Structure formats: C-alpha cells, structure tokens
Amino acid sequence: MKYIIEAFDKETEQLAYEIALPDGCDTQLAAIMGWIASQRGDEGYNLTSEQVAAIEVLANRTIHEHDHILQLTCNID
C-alpha cells in the first residue's frame, strides 16, 4: 500500500502539496490511525493534530498544518 499526505489550502481547497510516506509503514500507520481492518486502497482520512504529529515522527519531517487541511490517502501500489 502507498500512503500519501495531501495538503489542501484552507481558503481555496486546492491541493497545495503531497508527501509520500515511507514504504513499509502500514503497521505504524494502523496504530496512529486506529485502524482495525486492513485498508483496501481507496480510502481517505482527515487528520487530527495528534495524528499529524505522530506521522511527522514516522516520516521524519515537519508537516505544516496551520494553513492546510491535511488528509491521508491509501493507494494500491
């Protein structure tokens, strides 16, 4: 599964940028997101500040959320 953070401008709701998360992070993301079932590859989730903070650690980078709506998408490789 490929996971991507999509950042949308809060005013225009246009896609501002994307961040691909590291391969093999399924187990860590499941814990962060509270998933019980495996993902199908067509899901999208709005992210809370707590989830963003945990994903920043996982991705080893800062995600600027103050002026963006952040969503996590699950995509089949």
Predicted regions and their residues:
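Short, flexible N-terminal segments of the mature chain
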Residues: L15-R40
